[in-house]
């Protein structure tokens, strides 16, 4: 059995690496024979043990038992440890060492490491240090460990500061590579190891790399066929696939072994094996354990290759080859890969974070970062890692770019652009279909050509190989022989439109075969590709007999194409949208069953030069196409005759440079007044865009000279480009974006026509240019087939613009031209240029000579939650669906107002477009015509209004299958689709009274039942629109909930617990009612002090089930109604929990499906926190993670048994599992003694100290565990005495925990003050002390009345117990010198009424703030909710008036009118707010001509200074102040003596729409704000207000701090 044929590899002068198949007997024999010992210890993990431990134990025991009896027989011990990176720690090492000591192992022991890289690194380090070093053997079981970590003697453990930071070089005695182990390895793990194999070939051996490039399918096949009866152990039984696999492994190992032999201790050369690891390890530090080591290194290799390209060392050819090779092994090559981008942790991959992690790297020298730089495939720039500045690394890592304006340093520029995309794709198709071998030179290395080659490869249409270091592609044509890809394999084309159109016809050439296991070929693409039209081409092919089905939207990808061959003969094609439809048929026509006559119909043919190019290229490949002529006029007709033939491949075909790409460097010369020469493109070019220089740039004032193969442009002086009155760009449509960018800075108006087809490219390019130019302040006018651009001087353009590129390469490059003269322009999505010019940004700097900087959008954007993930752009438009009459328009208007967006009703849009209402349209043309037109409107809205809109759709949109698919795709990839839900009985009542829309042909309830499932499948969210009044909810509850919901789901302002995100102590209340409405009478008391409220869904029970003994799972409808009801009485975030019986709840453990449905419902309802038990299947958890949007996931584990030990391996295992998925981790055990709480506390302290740790809820249940509830700082679950029961044993109330924290010294008592005079009758102490008492806070608020700001106040604020102070007249200015900093509000208002002590890294800081404006703002928003405020009036010009103007500015009021008796003071105040729209009124009540009267009035003068009587002193208040009648309005009088001032009295007579707010309410509001600023807790305002109300009734002399100012 032990006679195995092995390949031996030498390392450090010893043949210690033995490679083969089924080697366990060989390993046992070799170890026992050559490494005599008293004890052999095999260490493995639980995963590997399940597969291989028994075989090792059996083999060693048999061989030990057969040893001579005369000698002492050695022992064979085994230790199984938990799997995963967490075992590779100081504790993991100590556990193994303790095992060895316990079993009295000595220095002659031999340790065998059986497992992956973690086991090898860890056990190797144990061997290096145990008894000062013992012998060990590596037996790697993963491909990654075989080719990387097991070879070279590196051993290490991880620390919280990084991976492998503590370790030693300790060479194993043997390394046994048993490739049969790979048969049990998941394919993802195999790919993980292939990253290291590709890396080794890339740095050292190009021949090996070529083999890896071309044989990926064979290599994968080698591990997918199990070897029966130990096949492969001997050479005679070894298959060809096994030989290939072994050669790949041995080849990779040999390179590393050679390098290690030369440089064992990594002083230079050994650095090379870290190619891809500098950046890869940084990525891994953030994404571990979800993304594997090899996957991170794969991305790292591409990024480090791009750094080399940026440095001018590696060509784009090399980067492209590396990219393709890694993709062939299913490895990610970009951080945008869905496997990475969909993870919550991906949000943490900021440039700053990655650079910070990269600082701790063993290759570095001090602060200098070192990266292995490739010079070409198979060679490195230096025989060691190279020092690379942070700026270069940051530029590559950044997702956006900024061009620094200036004159190109390399002027005059002379350069060539990449190969033409159009010609490259045509050449690939021609050569693949042709006979013989063709060498393609100057092929474009881009995303587009990569997907084309990959698709042709999948179709088995040709074979591809590289020569000349990748500069030449060798294509061996398949002569038109094509095969259906295997079942389940789709041809994924991304956003490559050219590939999609060409391959559609190519796939019709496929003939069915008995070997096929699929019935058709499926072509698909990304979300935008699925919107781009391909209908005319498909229609033409279908009419010719091809069977092609649209799988989703009609007229778009994906397509299913049956293998029936192309029939031929007569074809008619509409060619007014894309010339690529024509080229697609032309290219494939020779392979039809009959010669083809192709007739183009449907109006003017688009881009004729590109059709001519196709015909010319076909001729080069041996097929002549005849274009018919009119026999009378001799003019060409749009009819083409193509014979049956087979292309004959020319030996070599040189691809012309891309003319569209050439427009960008030429345009840079034009706009910067410099010279640029483009080689390989001139007047002889077949490409239409080659005319750009003569037809556009010359007319704009440039000097243009052109030969047959070269074009030179000299721009006019900067700022002197001329506008072109009109230019028809129909023959060069792609170049219109470049022309548009130049026209923006030209003198005059430019009109561009002939480009209608650009609306259906990668994006709607005409709209994209219009929208993005508007950010610069450039005016444009959209035309039916183009646009007009009104140019502006460069100096007048707005600076610092961030350009959205719509994932469109041409948009990005066009705006990079404009950015060369406009400072601060940020080009988002810089990587979208990889479609046609992957190294554009490098060439811009290296060849043109303009500095390009990377921009990390994460640091530019406002800081978001570290763990939240939004699956869409937060500006993505929201689509509302639902039955007619559910309130979509009502909700949409309020949502749009909240977000400052535009609400767009699809019915109104339809009416404008078709110039008739829906009812009339249906009457004239019927329902089907209406549904078709309605669907087109939906497509148009999604394309045209993709951002900043709330779009309300008609209820019947879901009747159209294509519309449902479009809505589902939008919800999955673009933005929220919200289903507005309303009880059906309310809907019926409303519709029976409504007459503006066509009546249904059937009962409303039947329509509802049919559509309800469709609404559910199309939406990403549900919003319950409750119209009826709910007891204990405020009248404004609906509008407040709409604001909360839409701010949350868009990610604009997620409704998360602020104390949690800021790191302070946080709590949630556990509701235990079967019906939450039972809590509403006491909801304000229940929620005192907490940050969130838990809805225990497993405890819910509808009233009909109260008497039932059996547990009944609550229905989705009941749970939805409970959430909706709770939303109307509290704005606190909801924690949605479905606790199962085994984890202490009531939900059945076996009902996983029902639990997941409820959790999905929570995410659809926009619930903020969703508790997900990690006992659910991983697949279900990942599905929930993918849906969570702005919601956060609490990954929880509960163990009621009392057996869970906080310092045992199980807790760490559960913690790591929860950390993979959760934004917050929750582990709950049961305390058996008080000591268990200290063990818990130590565990929490340890995991919280690691970099990037997540918020952690750790609690022990039971009476003995109450201390853990006090010490827990993250979302502690609390009860309340008013609840019917506690949710868990040992639960405490919020107040009890505060008392305990105080007794433990964790919540010291603080002193708060009111500074001012006179203040004896102030109610501020009552307000704050009542709040402290209710919440159980140990603080005290008192008066400090002094004659001046003197020593007493200085002593108070200097005391360590000082918690904060209110400041009133006359000290609002006098205290400022005592403070360290003022808030922006205090600076703008010019006064301080609040002092807040803040702790910083350098000590304590006193911050002055002003909360007056927040009190005013709160009172306005309470009455007007999210309604936009068109105009407001402020009366007075003192300090309170400043606060009012500041508040109104914060509310984005359209116009602020200011009146004061002393007009000069009013103007003085207006000048203090230069950026606010303040208009001084000469006469009160006289508004500017045509202006709408204000809907907000704030008076800041004493009541005694106002009057409603003529002929009396004071400001006369005219009744026309309250002329506004078009909606809710509010008047605030800051005076509170008397309770009803003349202004408020007048308002009450004005109209029902005017709400009145007395000054006392404002003062209370600003006091509540102060309370929260100081304590971090919301003031229990309802209870405080009740108490104060009683006091003010009983003691009229009690007042607040100040009267209003005159």
Swiss-Prot record:
Pathway as given in its UniProt record: Metabolic intermediate biosynthesis; chorismate biosynthesis; chorismate from D-erythrose 4-phosphate and phosphoenolpyruvate: step 2/7; Metabolic intermediate biosynthesis; chorismate biosynthesis; chorismate from D-erythrose 4-phosphate and phosphoenolpyruvate: step 3/7; Metabolic intermediate biosynthesis; chorismate biosynthesis; chorismate from D-erythrose 4-phosphate and phosphoenolpyruvate: step 4/7; Metabolic intermediate biosynthesis; chorismate biosynthesis; chorismate from D-erythrose 4-phosphate and phosphoenolpyruvate: step 5/7
Record note on quaternary structure: Homodimer.
PROSITE patterns the record matches: EPSP_SYNTHASE_1, EPSP_SYNTHASE_2, SHIKIMATE_KINASE
Role of this protein: The AROM polypeptide catalyzes 5 consecutive enzymatic reactions in prechorismate polyaromatic amino acid biosynthesis.
UniProt remark on cofactor binding: Binds 2 Zn(2+) ions per subunit.
Domain of life: Eukaryota
GO biological process: amino acid biosynthetic process; aromatic amino acid family biosynthetic process; chorismate biosynthetic process
Cellular component GO terms held in the UniProt record: cytoplasm
Stretches for region EPSP synthase: 403-850
EC number: 4.2.3.4, 2.5.1.19, 2.7.1.71, 4.2.1.10
Residue segments, region Shikimate dehydrogenase: 1309-1606
Residue ranges, annotated region (Shikimate kinase): 875-1070
Residues given in the record as 7-phospho-2-dehydro-3-deoxy-D-arabino-heptonate binding sites: 132, 148, 154, 164, 196-199, 256, 270-274, 277, 293, 362
Active site: residue positions: 266 (proton acceptor), 281 (proton acceptor), 832 (for epsp synthase activity), 1198 (proton acceptor), 1226 (schiff-base intermediate with substrate)
Residue positions binding ATP: 882-889
Keyword field contains ATP-binding: yes
Cofactor: Zn(2+)
3-dehydroquinase: region residues: 1071-1296
A GO molecular function held by the record: metal ion binding
Entry similarity comment: In the N-terminal section; belongs to the sugar phosphate cyclases superfamily. Dehydroquinate synthase family. In the 2nd section; belongs to the EPSP synthase family.
Catalyses which reaction(s): 7-phospho-2-dehydro-3-deoxy-D-arabino-heptonate = 3-dehydroquinate + phosphate; 3-dehydroquinate = 3-dehydroshikimate + H2O; shikimate + NADP(+) = 3-dehydroshikimate + NADPH + H(+); shikimate + ATP = 3-phosphoshikimate + ADP + H(+)
Residues that, per the record, bind Zn(2+): 196, 277, 293
Residues that bind NAD(+): 45-47, 85-88, 116-118, 121, 141-142, 163, 181-184, 192
Protein's UniProt name: Pentafunctional AROM polypeptide
